[in-house]
Amino acid sequence: MRLDSLLNLEKDNWKRTLVIIFFAQLTSAVGFSTIFPFLPLYVAELGSTTGLKLEFLAGAVFSAQALTMMLTSPFWGVLADRYGRKVMVVRANAGGAISILLMAFAQSAEQLVLLRALQGMLSGVISANNALVASVAPRRHTGLAMGLLQVGSGVGFALGPLLGGMIADWYGYRTVFYVTAGLLLFSVLLVLVGVYEEKDPEEKSSQRVHFLQVWKQAFNRTGVPAAYTLRFLASLGRMLLVPIIPLFIVSLSALSMSENTFTGLVVGVSSATTTVSAIFLGRLADRVGSRKVVLVCAMLTSLLFIPQFFITEGWQILLLQALVGIGVGGITPGISALLAGLSLHGEEGAAFGLDNAIDAGGRMVAPLVGSAVAVWFSLRAVFLANGVIYLLAGVLTGWLLLKQKGNGSRRRVSAPQG
């Protein structure tokens, strides 16, 4: 697809919506991730007013956001189908801006945890963006569209921590929250001005359907429960190493740089390969089917974790994690394209709201599982556990391929395919 084609400015052109949402996703990803590097340090600076241990509160600032997002995302998804997906994109960015701005005025670590919980309740930008793009992109281009959104979030999450760390060093922690809120408000303006969404008359009937009925309908679509299981496994696999990688790198000898710098390099390189591969594998999914791409990427990723059990030098984990990033770049947008193809037109909000809740559940559980495996067995055993998770994802995808043929792209007909 040529760039000049993507930049067609007609109001009803899906490519224009995709380009606007791509930049909005990039901006919001930078904004949300600027606070990641120093949140535990900010917790220590604020201190506790209730006597709770700072180690517990440092973990709670992450888990609280994931928990509330898991609980509220399905409701936001249904509301998106009823009242418009553009409105939900604006709501998610504005809600994130308000909650993060308030964090600059927190007076205790407990207040910060509550505000992070509020952020989880009000935000959910990625799922809102996915639902909007899935509702307008033609079936044959869903893989490309989801790949582009993955690129936007990948670049944003790679740049954000670097920007946040520099601002925190130069101007203090609280300034970062002001900058983040400003970036999210810019995304709000970008979507308000640049995105045009026309309400489909056929969707009005869904406004009288109860939340539970909408969710039941979504789960009853052939293949959707399997797609959600894939999302949970992918989220679990993606986040399992988060508490382990820094500790494992410290255990390696003869590093050419500090452990902190090398940890950042490993994470950054993996994110970079994920971002680059997402666009190419997304386009490939449009041609051969998202199931096939997810299957191959999951199986290869599973195999790549086996040699990581035997790593003895830093360059080895750097190389293998870079290759893992390529696989993840095909899995994440591939599952989004698969889900878009399995859900009916007009139900994208509900489908991706549930999807975001399941992803948040995986993010919440993964660090606990990774830590438990490390305690019960060893740090190296976590790599094998990760390989098993991706192997299960590959087996499940293979079962989907055998059960139902199709390319997993979104369609505008009554019978779901994918």
Annotate each predicted stretch with a short phrase.
Residues 60-76, 268-280:
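Central cavity-lining transmembrane alpha-helices of secondary-active solute carriers
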Residues 176-192, 383-399:
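Symmetry-related core transmembrane helices of the 12-TM Major Facilitator Superfamily/SLC fold
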Residues 115-153, 338:
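Cytoplasmic helix-loop-helix junction between adjacent transmembrane helices
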